[in-house]
Amino acid sequence: MRAVWVVFGVVVGGIALPLGWAWGRSFGRVRRVDDVPATGVALVLGAGVRWDGVPSRILQGRLDVAFELFRAGKVRRIIVSGSPESRGHSEPVVMRRYLRARGVPDEAVVLDESGVDTYSSCRTAAQEHDSLIVVTTRFHLRRSIALARRHGIDAHGVGHDAAADGLRRVNARATRREVLATVKAFWLPR
């Protein structure tokens, strides 16, 4: 019976410690468009492209947040980070096209095709930026800010609320996945 409690403690600690890390590193840094400090740069994390080359609904929500930041003057540049191959399309190219249709000039959009995951996106952004606003979905925001800060970026974040857009089932599934991804992120190298 004692071994069961030891295993239970290790499992709970193995989950609680990474979640505490993400919450601690992002404490006070999860903001809204109207109260996030202006940094000049936003990093939009990819979230998939449909087969017809249109951003997924979750990605559209993230891009809409980035557009609002641009329109509010909080950022002058938007880094769109994602996979170069998402259902036959480059995620960053699709993201730029969506932002262009909203009125963001191409010269304000920087493509990062090395963003195959959040860790890679943050690592690449850290090579040129010491502060930025991470734009992702709310369930993904704390881990994203924590990873950006691990790479030396003074990051704040603004999240899109997928549940408010009728994506509750996707949001619930992604939240469960996010716990495991946070555990993984905690153990990744710096």
Descriptions of predicted regions:
Residues 1-34:
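N-terminal type II signal-anchor transmembrane helix
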Residues 21-175:
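A structural signal for short, hydrophobic/glycine-enriched beta-strand patches
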